[in-house]
Swiss-Prot record:
Feature: compositional bias, Polar residues: 1-11, 81-90, 221-245, 294-305
Predominant localisation class: nucleus
Name of the protein this chain belongs to: Zinc finger protein tlp-1
Organism field: Caenorhabditis elegans
Domain of life: Eukaryota
């Protein structure tokens, strides 16, 4: 039996007419063109653009015009100062106040350069303290450190404070006259050698100048009386009587008790101080020689350089006066009136042990 049936394949193929605006490529192109446009324009121009190619051209022209307009607005905003955004960061200073200087708002740092603290200039310009202090010393004369700290001056030989000598005399302290009398004393000359950058001659000259400056207004000015009596060619009897009545008391304090002896001449006072209150150099030298020879004779039998494991540890030798002077010279804060404090401490320590 022969069966006649149709083929499994479609033989009468008729192509369906496809619209150009509904193809996938056309839809993709439409969505790419509408990106970045306002919502209203895409809805309005959607039908017209999809219907004809002229609508697509108009849509492209509209997009270009819109982009050009946005670029013009951005350029205007950059050029105009009113449209610049303001910073919202908090400011630490008010617009009417000056800006703080570096570091930490210290306004007086550059005034006292190279000293960051204005109080350091009083100590930095001391002779020999800093190599840069010579130029500052010649520029101006610095005030007294105690006056800058608003404290009573404790230096009896202070040239900047003329009332210090009278206050020291009232309080029972050492006055400038006593310091001028002891300027030639060996102990004072020894302490003067410890001062940083100040030789003995300049220290004695400083004492003499301070004594003359402080005692010029005082009632007991014996040096001026002697100088005027020597300078006058025809001295009057009143001047001779005043010269004879002038006496030189010894103000040396021993065990909290002043000497109290009175001399008519200054040479007698100086000799008395050297003989009674100053250690004789010959006796001290002889005692040092005897002790050194005794130590040498004792140590000759032993070997001090040999290490003994069972012996006691040897204590280090006490610092000599030269080493102490070098250490004090390295300290820039040592001032002339510290001599009185050091000497008074030594006297008080000896009194306590007695």
């Amino acid at each position: 039996m022969v069966s006649t049936h149709s083929s499994q394949y479609i033989t009468d193929f008729t192509p369906v007419p496809a619209e150009p605006g509904k193809s996938p490529l056309a839809l993709l192109a439409k969505t790419c063109e509408t990106i970045g446009l306002p919502e209203g324009s895409s809805k309005k121009n959607g039908a017209s653009s999809s219907s004809s190619p002229q609508g697509k051209k108009d849509e492209k022209n509209h997009i270009l015009h819109h982009q050009h307009h946005q670029q013009q607005q951005q350029s205007k905003q950059k050029s105009s100062p009113r449209s610049t955004p303001q910073s919202k960061e908090p400011t630490l200073t008010f617009p009417g106040l000056p800006k703080p200087s570096f570091p930490m708002g210290m306004p007086g740092m550059m005034q006292g350069f190279p000293f960051f603290n204005p109080m350091m200039t009083a100590y930095g310009c001391f002779p020999g303290a800093f190599p840069m202090s010579q130029g500052f010393m010649g520029a101006q004369r610095l005030p007294c450190p105690f006056a800058m700290m608003r404290q009573p001056c404790a230096n009896p030989a202070c040239v900047q404070c003329p009332s210090s000598s009278s206050n020291a005399a009232k309080n029972g302290q050492m006055t400038a006259e006593m310091m001028s009398q002891f300027a030639a004393h060996p102990l004072f000359s020894m302490y003067a050698g410890m001062m940083p950058g100040v030789p003995t001659s300049s220290y004695q000259a400083l004492l003499a100048a301070s004594a003359a400056a402080s005692t010029s207004a005082g009632p007991t000015d014996y040096s001026n009386v002697a100088s005027t009596s020597k300078a006058s060619p025809q001295p009057k009897p009143t001047a001779q009587k005043s010269q004879k009545s002038a006496k030189f008391p010894c103000n040396w304090v021993d065990s909290d008790v002043p000497c109290g002896k009175v001399f008519d001449e200054e040479n007698e006072l100086a000799s008395h101080v050297k003989k009674m209150h100053a250690p004789s150099p010959s006796s001290s030298a002889s005692s040092e020689q005897s002790t050194s020879t005794g130590k040498a004779s004792r140590s000759s039998t032993t070997t001090p350089h040999r290490f003994n494991p069972y012996g006691k540890p040897v204590a280090p030798a006490p610092p000599t006066m030269q080493q102490m002077g070098m250490n004090m010279a390295m300290n820039p804060l040592v001032l002339p009136f510290s001599l009185q404090a050091m000497y008074s401490n030594r006297l008080m320590s000896t009194v306590a042990h007695q």
